[in-house]
From Swiss-Prot:
Stored Gene3D superfamilies: P-loop containing nucleotide triphosphate hydrolases
Activity regulation note: ATPase activity is stimulated in the presence of linear double-stranded (ds)DNA. Helicase activity requires the presence of NurA. LhrC-Core (Hel112) inhibits the exonuclease activity of the HerA-NurA complex on ss- and dsDNA, has no effect on the nicking activity of NurA.
Physiological role: Involved in DNA double-strand break (DSB) repair. Probably acts with NurA to stimulate resection of the 5' strand and produce the long 3' single-strand that is required for RadA loading. NurA and HerA together stimulate the end-resection of six nucleotides of a linear DNA substrate. Has DNA-dependent ATPase activity and bidirectional DNA helicase activity. Preferentially binds single stranded (ss)DNA, bubble and semiforked DNA substrate over other DNA molecules tested. Stimulates the exo- but not endonuclease activity of NurA.
Annotated residues for binding of ATP: 142, 151-156, 459-460
EC class name: isomerase
EC numbers, comma separated: 5.6.2.3, 5.6.2.4
Listed name of the protein: DNA double-strand break repair helicase HerA
Any one GO BP annotation for this protein: DNA repair
Domain notes: Contains an N-terminal HAS-barrel domain, which mediates interaction with NurA, followed by a central RecA-like catalytic core and a C-terminal four-helix bundle.
UniProt entry keywords in alphabetical sequence: ATP-binding, DNA damage, DNA repair, DNA-binding, Helicase, Hydrolase, Isomerase, Nucleotide-binding
Catalytic activity field: Couples ATP hydrolysis with the unwinding of duplex DNA at the replication fork by translocating in the 5'-3' direction. This creates two antiparallel DNA single strands (ssDNA). The leading ssDNA polymer is the template for DNA polymerase III holoenzyme which synthesizes a continuous strand; ATP + H2O = ADP + phosphate + H(+); Couples ATP hydrolysis with the unwinding of duplex DNA by translocating in the 3'-5' direction
Similarity field: Belongs to the HerA family.
Amino acid sequence: MIIGYVIGQATTQEALILAERPVRLGTYVVLEYDNVKALGLITNVTRGSPMLDDNMNDIEIVQRLKQFNNSIPVYTKAKVKMLCDMNNHFLMPDIPPFAGTPAREAEDEELKSIYSQDGQIRIGSLIGKNVEVKLNINSFARHLAILAATGSGKSNTVAVLSQRISELGGSVLIFDYHGEYYDSDIKNLNRIEPKLNPLYMTPREFSTLLEIRENAIIQYRILRRAFIKVTNGIREKLKEGQIPFSTLNSQFYELMKDELETQGNSDKKSSAKDEVLNKFEEFMDRYSNVIDLTSSDIIEKVKRGKVNVVSLTQLDEDSMDAVVSHYLRRILDSRKDFKRSKNSGLKFPIIAVIEEAHVFLSKNENTLTKYWASRIAREGRKFGVGLTIVSQRPKGLDENILSQMTNKIILKIIEPTDKKYILESSDNLSEDLAEQLSSLDVGEAIIIGKIVKLPAVVKIDMFEGKLLGSDPDMIGEWKKVEESEKIAKGFADFGTEIGD
């Protein structure tokens, strides 16, 4: 169906069409000329009247025109972003359309050949079309950012993607900041308690958690020797069955204290020893709810074909950072081990999802998670570790990490500084697409990157089940409290009557 014709000057990047009828933003169109079959996306629509242009400033003239003839002539113009030449392996057109070239609405079958055939995971359908959009699972190794304003559908997107990846036999690990997924109706759910086991930590990692500075060489040496001796000793006793599981945590604490005292006996080391002891005791107090030597390694906890969810809701931000960074390190190191030997390490690829990523990957603060996330962003693809970051504050994210997220699912974004920040950190997001972000409805998204063949404007599927991130039924909850109070008052009155 013809919707309009090219007018004015066009380029291989964009064209302007004069439409025969009103057209919607996000409509896919086809322009055929000079053996080119160009697919385009309408990114801007304007309507006006030659009789009532911007120079009109007399309201009485407008009123008289309306009285004289109610059908004032109007026009509709639409800007078309050229996406590809469907006759040339989906490369960009190398010839611009000429004035008068007809633009027709793309047919479903044409769009299905682009968005429905090569992917493995259905994410939704093109807005206004009966065309499903499937994502390329292999390209998740190039990392993904899911960005949106609060309430625009981030959690729903994560739930839909995670469940469908698990249904393909894949493994997803979600660091659940608000507990949205831990008690959800996601199928194939594997709940993981957040624990840190020093037996699976390196001396450097342990010293970082104790906040021993890199230039504090004597302090690090004291801690390193004590940590290695104690953890090796505990491992040997465990093998020989000489230590009960129930006393592991208390024994680690006492053995570390004793060994630190021994390591720092000389006068030269005395002040450094005291400093390390203080930091160790502070560490054990701060992380008492997550330190657990009876806990198995995260590598043993994550399962293939599962949505593995680590609940962070009971932790403060320091503990969250410690847990997330440790798990990221173990996953990356373990995948490296498997790639090298095939006999040890994590045997399957995994996608790690960091919710509230602006907290852990802030552009203004250095965190342990930020270090290991940046390592995965650089190295993870080679070892089958994909990183997905989720945030409603894109401008708060570290720009180096965000720029390495080759794929992006961007839902409604209103804040201009957020849009600008996303645009500056994305090689494959154009300004005209970025301008559409504020006009998206809840659950609608622009998808760019290697996970789709071409940029897609998509209505994300609705997750079928409970997610705690949904808006609460406030009236319903108020009524429940009111009923409870009435029942309690009834019992109180009943007791008073008996007493009388």
